């Protein structure tokens, strides 16, 4: 079997950033999958499920309610390796096109107060596994270390 595209990226060189993982074509429609990489693979600890889960609920809520991008959001969710998340958007985009959106989203997570949307037994299959404080900490870290002064090498996969 051939390797899938996401495992052909050199994870030794990969740093936190926003990357186009793939583009899929459904007729004349394009779906862009973004790799929202938050930690350096195999260099620093992965994120725990509780903070990733809290982040997933907050990010999905923010994205689906966004005025411009909300109707284009197909999916937001964590990577199995727990080093980042995937965002799927309807449309043909490049990483630079969503830096503003991702910055707004992580500011929303960093500044969030109150009950996490959907964090109840009725709404979620694992609602007790959430850590808002760590989600906020990781959002702030990503903003400061990556998004607020993002460089070109954090927008294009390494060779």
What are these model-predicted stretches?
Residues 1-63:
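His/Glu-rich zincin catalytic helix
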Residues 4, 9-12, 18, 31, ...:
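Weak global preference for isoleucine
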Residues 34, 62, 69, 106-108, ...:
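Phenylalanine-focused residue identity feature
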Residues 41, 45-97:
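M16/MPP (pitrilysin/insulinase) zinc-metallopeptidase core fold and M16-derived inactive scaffolds
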Residues 50-52, 68, 92, 101-103, ...:
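Generic preference for flexible, low-structure residues
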Residues 76-148:
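Active-site-adjacent, His/Asp/Glu-enriched structural segments that form or flank metal-binding
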Residues 144-159:
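Histidine-acidic residue clusters that define the catalytic metal-binding segment
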């Amino acid at each position: 079997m051939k390797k899938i595209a996401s495992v052909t990226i050199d994870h030794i060189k990969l740093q936190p950033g926003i990357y186009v993982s793939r583009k899929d074509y459904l007729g004349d429609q394009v779906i862009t999958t973004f790799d929202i990489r938050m930690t350096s693979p195999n260099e620093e600890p992965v994120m725990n499920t509780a903070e990733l889960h809290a982040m997933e609920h907050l990010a999905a809520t923010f994205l689906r309610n966004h005025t411009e991008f909300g109707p284009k959001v197909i999916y937001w969710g964590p990577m199995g390796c727990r080093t980042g998340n995937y965002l799927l958007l309807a449309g043909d985009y490049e990483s630079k096109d969503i830096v503003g959106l991702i910055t707004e989203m992580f500011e929303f997570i960093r500044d969030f107060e109150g009950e996490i949307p959907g964090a109840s037994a009725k709404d979620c299959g694992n609602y007790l596994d959430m850590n808002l404080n760590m989600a906020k900490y990781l959002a702030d870290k990503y903003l400061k270390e990556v998004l607020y002064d993002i460089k070109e090498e954090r927008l294009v996969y390494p060779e």
